[in-house]
């Protein structure tokens, strides 16, 4: 696990080594154990390293045998050992046990597309082809690892950190009004956009090619979920896939643990992991209210599988102390309440392990969310999208069968999703039009006639990479903890999405196929228990937060976020507080947005100052073309 960063600057013709170092060290929490760089004229690349595999010899960059390919990576390639053996059979010589070295030789042997199609992992990759003078960037299939980029005439920059780019003097930090509109609707910014106009996100399953002589990115999709297939898989085959996925995610040269909520998904992972590594550490979080607390089930599972279990408590005082810390850990706003206890859990787990496995992805793959059960009666995605962007005739001009319910909670959880007027009052005239990415999304979804498959696929393309994995990555990396999601294995995802609807839902029972195979490892009490969901007493906590600030109105009036009418935000908050906090998700999303923006601007100002100092330092200092430690 690392953080990567790089620049191409043909305007200046070179990159200040001190500037590169400063950009790299923005990500020190992503990689506190080491660093590496590559400098050659107008091209500069660097990384911070969290040592997980081959602690002694895994420093980056890695080169091909001829030295013409330079490889950096953030993440893990889980099938690197199999790829390594194939390359060794082709007479490639390895000098380490690092998975990143496989990328350098694999690129030489198979090219970028051939390499990417062979990878099972979570990654953001940067590979420089010195022969063709091209930089290749790629992000993993399901968006587990972040990768941002920006470009202007003669300049291109990329990073695992959005902040590292936003502080560059040639990058505008203007808030994107359409992104603000989407945040108010969804509580995250989906797709290739970010909250800033000038900074884009590499999509999950996307790669970029950038010429070092003309650094304008060319975008290519190398992976798209296959829709339309329907295939039943035997319990034996599915169980073997899940077991192999967990086993591959246990590979590390540092201690590994499991986040154990007590629900089905994490319990399956913990049980398999405990079979592979007896007495493995497991971690759970509890709450004051029994209606929100699954910890008793987590303790039951931990006792059954014999894990070394650690339990932590989260309450209102934790909320008050952690909200500013969570906001500071984010480089983009995500209004997801669950990241608060997750931040705490990651902090405590890091005292015991360096890697933690979690159950992200299972609800999307095997249809675990409650709203999937109501998909047949939900309004269509297309109608919602049409309402959100103010196109009431959208359903008439496009196929009406696209999808039934994209959001991972009931519509009441996102009160502004279809309320265009409400969002316009909060954010002025920033009404978003349908983007090229959304048009492509709708066309892709139309390949499947199975509305349940389309609902899950929508979540896999939006909610999963742009909320769940952002939350998981940022909260874990804030504590230099590597988070891994075993269900997000290409074979498990493809197999799960292709299962017939009856293998996912049967009346009130969700995740039918996963529950059946879970009986191999877990007691019926856990296997048969309905999904509880992750719900915090946020309404009460928000009321207490704003009381401590004087009032909701006073809090928002005293703070400013470009693109938001703070007077209207204050009015909405005051009205909702007086009514008993009916729209707690919206209030939390607005509170998080404000806390994030205040923190981000403070960090950006300080980083910009450090960039200026670095840029004015003597360019004549001798810096090796490559280095690591």
Regions found by a protein language model. Name each.
Residues 1-330, 342, 346, 519-520, ...:
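Cysteine-centered catalytic environments shared across enzyme families
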Residues 332-336:
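Acceptor-substrate binding/catalytic loop of class I
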Residues 365-392:
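A mobile, often basic/glycine-rich helix-loop segment
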Residues 99-102, 124, 363-364, 389-393:
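Conserved A3 ("GATE") glycine/threonine-rich loop of ANL adenylate-forming enzymes
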Residues 353-369:
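Short acidic/histidine-rich active-site segments
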């Amino acid at each position: 696990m690392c953080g990567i960063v790089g620049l191409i600057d043909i305007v200046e013709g070179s990159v200040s080594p001190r500037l590169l170092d400063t950009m790299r060290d923005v990500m020190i929490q992503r990689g506190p154990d080491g660093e590496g760089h590559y400098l050659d004229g107008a091209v500069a690349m660097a990384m911070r390293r969290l040592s997980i595999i081959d602690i002694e010899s895994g420093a980056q960059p890695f080169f091909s045998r001829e030295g013409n390919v330079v490889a950096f990576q953030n993440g893990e390639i889980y099938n690197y050992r199999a790829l390594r053996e194939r390359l060794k059979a082709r007479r490639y010589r390895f000098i380490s046990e690092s998975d990143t070295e496989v990328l350098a030789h694999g690129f030489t042997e198979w090219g970028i597309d051939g390499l990417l199609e062979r990878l099972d992992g979570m990654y953001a990759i940067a590979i420089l082809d010195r022969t063709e003078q091209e930089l290749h960037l790629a992000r993993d299939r399901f968006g587990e690892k972040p990768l941002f980029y920006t470009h202007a005439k003669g300049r291109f920059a990329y990073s695992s950190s959005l902040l590292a780019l936003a502080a560059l003097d040639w990058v505008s930090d203007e808030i994107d009004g359409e992104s603000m509109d989407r945040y108010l609707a969804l509580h995250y910014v989906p797709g290739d956009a970010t909250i800033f106009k000038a900074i884009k996100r590499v999509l999950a399953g996307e790669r970029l090619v950038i010429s070092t002589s003309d650094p304008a990115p060319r975008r290519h999709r190398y992976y798209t979920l296959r829709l339309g297939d329907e295939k039943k898989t035997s319990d034996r085959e599915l169980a073997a896939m899940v077991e192999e996925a967990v086993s591959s995610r246990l590979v590390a040269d540092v201690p590994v643990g499991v986040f154990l909520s007590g629900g089905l998904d994490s319990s399956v992972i913990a049980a398999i992991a405990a079979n592979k590594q007896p007495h493995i550490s497991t971690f759970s979080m509890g709450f004051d209210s029994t209606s929100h607390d699954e910890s008793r089930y987590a303790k039951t599972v931990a006792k059954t599988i014999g894990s070394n279990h650690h339990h932590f408590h989260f309450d209102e005082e934790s909320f008050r102390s952690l909200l500013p810390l969570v906001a500071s850990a984010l480089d983009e706003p995500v209004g997801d309440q669950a990241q608060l206890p997750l931040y705490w859990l990651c902090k405590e787990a890091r005292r015991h392990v360096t890697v933690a496995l979690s159950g992200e992805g299972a609800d999307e793959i095997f249809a675990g969310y409650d709203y999937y059960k109501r998909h047949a009666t939900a309004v269509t995605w297309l109608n919602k999208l049409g309402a959100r962007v103010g196109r009431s005739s959208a359903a008439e001009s496009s196929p009406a069968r696209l999808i039934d319910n994209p959001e991972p909670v009931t519509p009441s959880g996102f009160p502004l999703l279809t309320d265009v007027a409400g969002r316009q009052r909060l954010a002025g005239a920033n009404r978003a039009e349908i983007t090229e990415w959304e048009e492509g999304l709708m066309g892709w979804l139309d390949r499947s006639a199975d509305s349940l498959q389309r609902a899950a696929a929508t979540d896999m393309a939006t909610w999963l990479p742009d909320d769940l994995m952002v939350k998981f990555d940022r909260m874990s990396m804030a504590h230099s903890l590597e988070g891994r999601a075993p269900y997000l294995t290409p074979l498990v995802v493809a197999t799960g999405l292709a299962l017939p609807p009856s293998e996912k839902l049967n009346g009130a029972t969700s995740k039918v196929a996963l529950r059946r195979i879970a009986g191999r490892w877990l007691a019926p009490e856990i296997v048969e228990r309905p999904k509880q969901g992750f719900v915090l007493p946020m309404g009460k906590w928000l009321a207490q937060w704003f009381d401590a600030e004087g009032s909701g109105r006073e809090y928002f009036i005293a703070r400013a976020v470009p693109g938001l009418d703070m007077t209207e935000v204050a009015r909405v908050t005051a009205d909702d507080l007086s009514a008993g906090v009916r729209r707690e998700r919206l209030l939390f999303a607005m509170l998080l947005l404000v806390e994030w923006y205040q923190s981000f601007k403070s960090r950006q100002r300080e980083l910009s100052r450090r960039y200026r100092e670095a840029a004015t330092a003597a360019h004549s200092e001798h810096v090796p073309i490559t280095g690591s430690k």
